[in-house]
UniProtKB/Swiss-Prot annotation:
Oligomeric and partner information: Probable component of the PAM complex at least composed of a mitochondrial HSP70 protein, Roe1, TIM44, blp/TIM16 and TIM14. Associates with the TIM23 complex.
GO CC annotation, single: TIM23 mitochondrial import inner membrane translocase complex
Protein name, per record: Mitochondrial import inner membrane translocase subunit Tim16
Family: Belongs to the TIM16/PAM16 family.
UniProt entry tagged with the keyword Mitochondrion: yes
InterPro entries: J_dom_sf, Tim16
Principal subcellular localisation of the protein: mitochondrion
Subcellular location(s) per record: Mitochondrion inner membrane
Annotated source species: Drosophila melanogaster (Fruit fly)
Functional description taken from the UniProt entry: Regulates ATP-dependent protein translocation into the mitochondrial matrix. Essential for larval development.
GO biological process: instar larval development; protein import into mitochondrial matrix
Annotated tissue distribution: Expressed in distinct cells in the embryonic and larval nervous system.
One Pfam family hit: Pam16
Length: 141
């Protein structure tokens, strides 16, 4: 009798171990996929932060505002204003949809700002290195 109980315990532990291993592998794969989608590194961190702040991904925002190029500010503004006005509550629109439109524009604005900041920091870094090299050449003289 004890032999059968021991076998049941061993088989149960093996089944639980296999299930745990499979779940762990799936979690690792999902984590790697999420990191790949986010872009990884600092850019991925900024993208994830924007997603959390607005509660919406860049793809969702582009779909809501019917935008192909997230850098086209004129199209974003035009579509945002149209959709926001069409969904006014006083005109029988939906506050929920109106808030989604607002969040989509907010998410796209974050994306535009994120693309502008690295450019300005790159030019500042280039200026800093130029100034450093000039000061070094002056010190050598």
């Amino acid at each position: 009798m004890a032999k059968y109980i021991a076998q049941i315990i061993v088989l149960g532990a093996q089944a639980v171990g296999r299930a745990f291993t499979k779940a762990l592998r799936q979690e690792i794969a999902a984590s790697q996929e999420a990191a790949r989608r986010a872009g990884g590194g600092k850019q991925g961190d900024k993208s994830a932060e924007s997603n959390l702040r607005t509660g919406m991904t860049l793809e969702e925002a582009k779909q809501i505002l019917n935008i192909d190029d997230p850098k086209n500010v004129d199209a974003i503004t035009k579509n945002y204003e149209h959709l926001f006005q069409v969904n006014e509550r006083s005109k029988g629109g939906s506050f929920y949809i109106q808030s989604k439109v607002f969040r989509a524009k907010e998410r796209l604005d974050h994306e535009i700002k994120a693309h502008e900041q690295p450019r300005s920091s790159n030019t500042e870094a280039a200026q800093d290195t130029a100034e450093e090299s000039q000061s070094r050449s002056r010190q050598r003289r």
